[in-house]
């Protein structure tokens, strides 16, 4: 996993060049957006339990068969595993938004996830719905301007959306 700074330095080093003014400008933009990025990560982390719990409740309200006898989230140990998995995905999305890069999400969370769920008989489409619900909650938090530095957060929200979409697509 390389952060944006390491990538830029590695690119310049591979060419045997100093950082260009364009690369320096890009890094300056990253620094300027850093507080918003960290605020978003902090909001997600501070609300992780509620994000996961509320998303699971919404999923089970839409798909009650999952939590009933014979469902993939029944009995309680399977429900706990479901909540744990949702929390892991959310945690890795928060790492990706902090790093500004999806490689940690891809490498440590998503690679092989579809195959694991298939082997367990877990419906990937239901997992994708849960991830989309976490996405909605996280984007709502990211868009909450209360206590966030002034400025446009649309690119950060779009980036956050991409990470959740990537996670949802990886399980179906």
UniProtKB/Swiss-Prot annotation:
The keyword Membrane applies. Keywords: Antenna complex, Bile pigment, Chloroplast, Chromophore, Electron transport, Membrane, Methylation, Photosynthesis, Phycobilisome, Plastid, Thylakoid, Transport. The modification N4-methylasparagine is found at residue 72. This is C-phycocyanin beta chain. One of its GO terms (cellular component) is chloroplast thylakoid membrane. It comes from Aglaothamnion neglectum. Heterodimer of an alpha and a beta subunit, which further assembles into trimers and the trimers into hexamers. The basic functional unit of phycobiliproteins is a ring-shaped hexamer formed from two back-to-back trimers contacting via the alpha chain subunits. The trimers are composed of alpha/beta subunit heterodimers arranged around a three-fold axis of symmetry. The phycoerythrins also contain a gamma subunit which is located in the center of the hexamer. Its main location: plastid. Belongs to the phycobiliprotein family.
């Amino acid at each position: 996993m390389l952060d944006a700074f390491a990538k830029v330095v590695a690119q310049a080093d591979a060419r045997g060049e100093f950082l260009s003014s364009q690369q320096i400008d890009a890094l300056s933009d990253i620094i300027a957006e850093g507080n918003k990025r960290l605020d978003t990560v902090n909001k997600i982390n501070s609300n992780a339990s509620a994000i996961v719990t509320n998303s699971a409740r919404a999923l089970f309200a839409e798909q009650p068969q999952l939590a009933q006898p014979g469902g993939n989230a029944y009995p309680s140990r399977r429900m706990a595993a479901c909540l744990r998995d949702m929390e892991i995905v959310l945690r890795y999305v928060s790492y990706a938004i902090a790093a500004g890069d999806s490689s940690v999400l891809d490498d440590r969370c998503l690679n092989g996830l579809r195959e694991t769920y298939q082997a367990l008989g877990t419906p990937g489409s239901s997992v994708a719905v849960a991830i989309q619900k976490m996405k909605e909650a996280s984007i709502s938090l990211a868009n909450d301007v209360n206590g966030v530095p002034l400025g446009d957060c649309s690119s950060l929200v779009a980036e956050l959306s991409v990470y959740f979409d990537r996670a949802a697509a990886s399980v179906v």
